[in-house]
Regions:
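Active-site-adjacent structural elements in enzyme catalytic domains
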Residues: 109, 121-140, 147, 182-200, ...
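Second-shell residues forming the walls of enzyme active-site clefts
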Residues: 74, 124-139, 143, 149-153, ...
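Preference for extracellular/luminal or secreted protein segments
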Residues: 40-105, 322, 331, 352-638
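Short, conserved catalytic-motif segment at the N-terminal edge
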Residues: 655-721, 742-743
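Bacterial N-terminal signal peptides
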Residues: 28-39
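Short acidic, glycine-rich surface-loop motifs adjacent to enzyme active sites
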Residues: 86, 102-121, 207, 217, ...
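Bacterial N-terminal signal peptides that target proteins for export
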Residues: 16-29
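Loop/turn elements at helix/coil->beta-strand transitions in domains of secreted/extracellular proteins
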Residues: 75-81, 109-113, 135-139, 199-205, ...
Length: 743
């Protein structure tokens, strides 16, 4: 078994299916390219190794574990493995009563995995390790890191009443912001960083990327979770995210199949309807899913949507349709990964079928995982009874459980299911990751219109500035960074805050403030899912903003719904920040005052005001206050060093091998191998560098540059490319071929 970065990557003599053959061909092409690069004397860019790995194919020992585990399961245990249940992400002591239901699911129901919600990275690790210790079969851990990356779940915690942020994972702008950037490099790093931080926190599988084409401006549930309204853009950026997540060591899930973008009902509260036939699906909704499957996406999540033009007026939702899951997805698109239902707690399913029957029908249709049934025992009992009644067979259940066990084995969970807290400290919310997130937010800011030429604003302009802010009362983080930054730039700015509780007196006071202003900044934090109507903006607010826009220099900033301006037709200067979190607030503020260039483009239309691709450019006109951003995402990720050329080994610190999970004794054996080679005259000298997880753990020199030269080798000795290519090309090629079972 070959090992890359301390992790096994394959088995000998593995069977060669069509997908595996394609992987091998790509590997051969990679090897050929590497040989060409080394021969030409140009080293390939150095990649930052992921702290966790996945094997490509199963070694014999892992395959044996899968089959023996399957054979040992009773019918009830087999069905239990199909269930993955939502759990709170916050810290709870294993001795607390709050831990008891979680423990019962794992110990008594023997569920296959858990999906933690909002918490902190250390709380994740503590809770997941405690549950893994109680599980007879290792748990597969999934999480919704779909919209904002790790920060969607392992950040966003604040201490009340002070609202002090508790820190956590890297928070990216929403997925649609990456559509506004349009650069695959950013989508790739979005996936890679999300995966690295997920794995460090104990999460194995991302419920991401969202592959829905958001071509309906009235969609209340997908919106900024999507890359955009262009299926080719969604496909391209989704594929880049998948590639990045693979490098980061996590599994990916494309969702929501066969598409949830062209809907106007939230499936959490009702059943959306997509009026598309097969030809329309092929030309729009299915394009990103087909590309993702070609890219090797590991899992697909279903959509709770009705498709009357495909399944008939009385047809079941896609989640419960064998025609969609087994016919369209498995047969037509040749998907052979794990198939998840969307959460079965959602009313689009439960209102009509109930938990038990919905679980049975989902498995009948072809689903491998029953996600978040809420009543775990009811779901398991219903599927067990359906099997005893002949609606399902044990073989059918084993096929699904085998897929899940293979995932766990590829992750090495049958050998070690636990995560070290040290992994959290090493990578979660690291400076490089935060810089990348800030850079993405900056690049995504989109200036949709600016008829009056108000953007960028001058901070020192001698006029009274009024900041009119609207957000839900429960959104305590709304405008925290924006308001603080605005006061830092315009100390005399006056803020007027409104929310859904504001009465006529509050609006009258706000109108007085606007009337006295020399210019008005309007920031609105309203997600599309708040409710129905014109972006859920109350009529008094719409009237106030439209009046301000006709009487005063007014700039509108949207921190959630990009479609907001449809309800405010009199606004001519409109900035879209895409997200409400602080990373987007800082970026919008910098754009507003010209501290950074504005280059974003709409990945969606805003009918009838703007089309896909619209967006005005603005140059940077003043020095940035926040300098954490970088111009190149590869620099932010540490993949490319722009600091200048350095002699290798110079200013390099050597870490303790134990800090990256390596053995000092093992390194000593490597030294002895080199010393033996020199004794046998296999070489006159050698330089050795060993690293793992971005840390150098050994840097040594042996012997002399030429026999009898008297010139010792040093760690900074410069070698000709012929000497380097022999080692790098041959060793890398051998490791790849061993990993693919060809050598």
């Amino acid at each position: 078994v070959a090992v890359v970065d301390g992790e096994p990557i394959g088995e000998r003599n593995a069977p060669m299916g069509p997908r595996r053959t394609a992987v091998v061909l790509r590997r051969v092409a990679t090897i050929a390219a590497l040989a060409l690069i080394t021969a030409c004397g140009a080293p390939p860019p150095a990649a930052v190794p992921a702290p966790f790995g996945r094997v490509l194919g199963l070694e014999a020992e892992a395959r044996l574990w899968v089959e023996q585990t399957l054979e040992s399961l009773t019918l009830e245990e087999l069905v239990g493995q199909l269930v993955i249940e939502w759990i709170p992400g916050g810290y709870v002591s294993p001795s607390s009563p709050d831990f008891e239901p979680l423990e019962r699911w794992v110990v008594e129901d023997k569920i296959g995995g858990v999906s933690p919600s909002i918490g902190t990275p250390h709380a994740y690790v503590a809770k997941l390790n405690a549950l893994q210790a109680r599980a007879e079969i290792p748990l597969l851990v999934t999480a919704d890191f779909e919209n904002g990356g790790p920060g969607m779940r392992i950040n966003g915690s604040y201490a009340l009443p002070s609202m002090l942020p508790q820190g956590g994972g890297t928070t990216f702008p929403p997925t649609m912001a990456f559509g506004a950037i349009g650069d695959e490099r950013f989508a790739y790093e979005y996936g890679r960083i999300t995966a690295v931080e997920a794995r460090a926190s104990g999460v194995h599988l991302l419920f991401a990327p969202v592959l829905d084409v958001n071509n309906n401006a009235d969609n209340p549930v997908i919106a900024s979770r999507s890359f955009g309204a262009d299926p080719e853009l969604v496909a391209r950026l989704g594929a880049a995210f998948i590639r990045g997540a693979k490098e980061g060591g996590a599994y990916t899930t494309g969702k929501h199949f066969p598409g949830h973008g062209d809907t106007s009902v939230d499936s959490h509260i009702g059943l959306p309807v997509i009026l598309a036939d097969r030809a329309r699906l092929d030309s729009l909704e299915l394009i990103p899913f087909d590309r993702a499957i070609q890219e090797g996406v590991d899992a697909i999540m279903t959509a709770h949507v009705a498709l009357p033009n495909l399944l008939g007026a009385a047809g079941p939702p896609a989640t419960l349709s064998s025609e969609i899951l087994t016919g369209l997805l498995r047969a037509d698109l040749a998907f052979d990964g794990v198939l998840f239902t969307d959460a079965l707690t959602m009313r689009a399913i439960t209102d009509a079928y109930g938990i038990g029957e919905a679980s049975v029908r989902a498995v009948e249709a072809g689903a491998d995982v029953i996600l978040s049934p809420k009543d775990v025992s009811a779901a398991i009992s219903a599927v067990v009874q359906a099997t005893r009644d002949g609606r399902l067979t044990r073989t059918r259940l084993e096929n699904s459980v085998r897929r899940l066990l293979e995932m766990k084995a590829e992750l090495g969970l049958h050998r070690n299911r636990f995560v070290s807290l040290d992994a959290v400290d090493a990578v979660v919310g690291s400076g490089a990751h935060l810089a990348l997130a800030d850079s993405a937010a900056v690049r995504s800011i989109t200036l949709v219109g600016d008829a009056g030429g108000l953007v960028p604003m001058r901070a020192e302009a001698p006029v009274e500035t009024v900041h009119l802010l609207y957000a839900r009362s429960s959104w305590l983080w709304a405008s925290r960074a924006f308001s603080q930054g605005l006061l830092a730039r315009v100390p005399g700015a006056r803020e007027v805050r409104l929310d859904e509780r504001s009465d006529a007196a509050a609006y009258a006071s706000a109108a007085e403030a606007v009337a006295s202003a020399g210019r008005v900044i309007v920031s609105v934090y309203v997600p599309p899912s708040v409710g129905s109507g014109e972006e859920a903006l109350p009529e008094p607010l719409r009237a106030l903003v439209n009046q301000a826009a006709t009487e005063k220099p007014t700039v509108l900033l949207s921190f959630a719904s990009p479609y907001l301006v449809r309800a405010l037709p009199d606004v001519s200067s409109y900035l879209v920040a895409w997200g409400d979190r602080e990373v987007s607030q800082r970026a919008a503020l910098g754009a507003l005052f010209g501290e950074q260039a504005i280059t974003g483009r709409l990945p969606i239309p805003i009918p009838p005001l703007a089309a896909i691709g619209d967006g005005l450019d603005r140059a940077q006109v003043t020095t940035r206050i926040d300098t954490r951003t970088v111009d190149d995402p590869l620099v932010a990720a540490g993949i490319v060093d722009r600091a200048g050329r350095r002699v290798f080994g110079q200013d390099q610190s050597v870490a303790d091998p134990a800090s990256v999970g390596m053995s000092a004794e093992g390194l000593a054996r490597v030294d002895s191998i080199i010393e033996a080679a020199l004794t046998d005259s296999a070489a006159s000298g050698a330089a050795l560098a060993i690293g793992r997880r971005g840390q150098l753990v050994s840097l040594k020199a042996f012997g002399e540059l030429a026999y009898g030269s008297g010139r010792p080798v040093t760690p900074t000795s410069i070698w000709d490319m012929a000497s380097v290519s022999k080692v790098v090309g041959t060793t890398t090629a051998a490791m790849m071929l061993v990993g693919d079972g060809l050598l």
